[in-house]
Amino acid sequence: MSRTFYDKLWDDHVIYSEEDGTATIYIDRQLLHEVTSPQAFEGLNLAGRPVWRISANLAVSDHNVPTTDRSEGITDPISKLQVDTLDQNCDAFGITQYKMNDTRQGIVHVIGPEQGATLPGMTVVCGDSHTSTHGAFGALAFGIGTSEVEHVLATQTLLMKKSKNMLVKVDGRLQPGSTAKDIVLAVIGKIGTAGGTGYTIEFAGEAIRNLSMEGRMTLCNMAIEAGARASLVAVDETTIEYIQGRPYAPKGAAMLQALQYWRTLHSDPDAKFDAVVELRAEEIAPQVTWGTSPEMVLAISDRVPDPEKERDSNKRSAMERALQYMNLNPNTPISSIAVDKVFIGSCTNSRIEDIRAAAKVIDRLGKKVAANVKLALVVPGSGLVKAQAEREGLDRIFKAAGFEWREPGCSMCLAMNADRLEPGERCASTSNRNFEGRQGNGGRTHLVSPAMAAAAAIEGHFVDVRKIS
């Protein structure tokens, strides 16, 4: 019987199934951070339970850590408590953790793949919705709640029901200037933020195969914004090349054995999907969100939509509210929207390829950050990414142009640390969510690629990076 890639991963991890479809599945890897783990560890302590498989866990603090000078530690008492609590829990249970001053510290969805802790064929969970990122490696990866974090710590299993299968096929080749971020924003714009609800998405097609692992991680990272439980990209030589030699990757004979299995991790040619979505890569222009949901997205050449032209009353109402919050008028050219701040970072776009792309645009433009831009931040996804960028001299390009070059962390993706927007400020952001208040109370977020964010910082407004030669 022909199976999809998701079917294969599911079947390989089911321990027991109930008649109603609820299954007990085995979890190969759990990633932990400081926000969703304290209650889970407290539950273990209260019940007197040990961690079932210590080596299956890897922890890091990322949401609350400062991205400026860390010599004085964390000043916010709540943030400090969460980080200190993770340190104490990992020490007590013997779990490997990259603490704040460890060079390997960074955003959980950056450091997992970077260390080779995310491998093809695994089930990977984390108390974080963007765990779907790890599907780029052919792993079944999804976010879980705090009670489930405790359950995995205690049993290395979860109870869940199988998703339906969706294929998102992107054939053709991207235009220069369009990126994986633009692909996934275009997909969300096409199917909506509920389009993937109940599904695991497999991304396939020529354009997907041509993406680097960094690009694939960006793609899978935002599948959750389409409502999907998880997302996958089939394993190929690009996947294998990225993994080889990393600390957690198999070595020697174990690697040869793993390769035999990994090369089976794809959908069968005649596998049936419950839904199929198709896009042409060459038709995908650089994307910019205009509203307060990732599905409110348009090409850089478009204009802000007019709610009066929307027939659906619910959608029209949502558009009107979004325009009011974003302080935008219908029919405004996207390219004329000025920004106050620029954020290049997050688990979506803070890897070395992202930083190179942004630096390349800045270098080509040869100018400094525009006078109307109050702050332009570059926050590498990990200490190792930061070190690599500095070896390549990328930090000097940013600093010479007037950007701030920061320490790794989640930073301005969410208003959980010192990096945030003030009310009314507008930000070009490479993150994944543009909800009301996401980057700070009253802050206005436009999601874009690293190249688009860099160009907006220099020009002071959104521009089409395809025109930058």
Curated annotation (Swiss-Prot):
CDD domains: IPMI. GO terms for molecular function: 3-isopropylmalate dehydratase activity; 4 iron, 4 sulfur cluster binding; metal ion binding. Its EC number is 4.2.1.33. Disulfide bonds: none annotated. [4Fe-4S] cluster binds at C347, C410, C413. Pfam families: Aconitase. It catalyses: (2R,3S)-3-isopropylmalate = (2S)-2-isopropylmalate. It comes from the Bacteria. Keywords: 4Fe-4S, Amino-acid biosynthesis, Branched-chain amino acid biosynthesis, Iron, Iron-sulfur, Leucine biosynthesis, Lyase, Metal-binding. Binds 1 [4Fe-4S] cluster per subunit. Its cofactor is [4Fe-4S] cluster. Gene3D superfamilies: Aconitase, domain 3. Pathway: Amino-acid biosynthesis; L-leucine biosynthesis; L-leucine from 3-methyl-2-oxobutanoate: step 2/4. InterPro entries: 3-IsopropMal_deHydase_lsu, Acnase/IPM_dHydase_lsu_aba_1/3, Acoase/IPM_deHydtase_lsu_aba, Aconitase_4Fe-4S_BS, Aconitase_4Fe-4S_dom, IPM_dehydratase_rel_enz, IPMI_cat. One of its GO terms (biological process) is L-leucine biosynthetic process. Belongs to the aconitase/IPM isomerase family. LeuC type 1 subfamily. Heterodimer of LeuC and LeuD. Catalyzes the isomerization between 2-isopropylmalate and 3-isopropylmalate, via the formation of 2-isopropylmaleate. This is 3-isopropylmalate dehydratase large subunit. It comes from Polynucleobacter necessarius subsp. necessarius (strain STIR1).
